[in-house]
């Protein structure tokens, strides 16, 4: 039995110091390790500078396009019904969850790259995601294919 009576209010997040953007602030918070926010900010802004030097494009625009391309369109979940686990199927999606997954995937696959420093890893992943390639985009496509393959179970309403 639930003890809470009302809705949970989402936390208020301030925009980042440079662009005053809440999405960048969320990205920096997810990038942060051991509470070292200043280090995470430095890595993020250095990555944007690397993008500006390599491409000559607006790094803020590159980041936004990369994040938009990395956001999944569908989510797949397994469901247990009557002792049987049904395969992963497509489910409804909330905008905040799409953003969170896109951020999480960009950071995870940036850390897995072979470049020397984190700023270079992050910049490379942003540039690849903007072009529609890269590991984060591959993850998004894999999930979409899984949802398409298991569309037979999408008629269930839980």
From Swiss-Prot:
Keywords of this entry: Ribonucleoprotein, Ribosomal protein, RNA-binding, rRNA-binding, tRNA-binding
GO BP field: translation
Signal sequence region: none
InterPro entries with a match to the protein in the record: Ribosomal_uS7 (IPR000235), Ribosomal_uS7_bac/org-type (IPR005717), Ribosomal_uS7_CS (IPR020606), Ribosomal_uS7_dom (IPR023798), Ribosomal_uS7_dom_sf (IPR036823)
GO cellular component, one term: small ribosomal subunit
GO molecular function: rRNA binding; structural constituent of ribosome; tRNA binding
PROSITE patterns, A to Z: RIBOSOMAL_S7
Role summary: One of the primary rRNA binding proteins, it binds directly to 16S rRNA where it nucleates assembly of the head domain of the 30S subunit. Is located at the subunit interface close to the decoding center, probably blocks exit of the E-site tRNA.
Complex and partners: Part of the 30S ribosomal subunit. Contacts proteins S9 and S11.
Name recorded for this polypeptide: Small ribosomal subunit protein uS7
């Amino acid at each position: 039995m639930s003890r809470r009576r009302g809705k949970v209010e989402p936390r208020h997040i301030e925009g980042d110091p440079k662009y005053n953007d809440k999405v960048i602030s969320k990205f920096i918070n997810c990038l942060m390790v051991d509470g070292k926010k200043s280090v995470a900010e430095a890595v993020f802004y250095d990555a944007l500078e690397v993008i500006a030097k390599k491409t000559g494009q607006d790094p803020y625009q590159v980041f936004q396009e990369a994040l938009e391309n990395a956001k999944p369109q569908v989510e797949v979940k397994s469901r247990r019904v009557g002792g049987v686990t049904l395969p992963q199927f497509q489910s409804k999606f909330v905008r905040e969850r799409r953003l969170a997954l896109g951020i999480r995937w960009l950071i995870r696959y940036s850390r897995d790259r072979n470049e020397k420093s984190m700023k270079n890893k992050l910049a490379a992943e942003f540039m690849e995601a903007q072009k529609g390639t890269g590991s984060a985009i591959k993850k998004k496509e894999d999930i979409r294919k899984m949802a398409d393959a298991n569309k037979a179970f999408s008629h269930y309403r839980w």
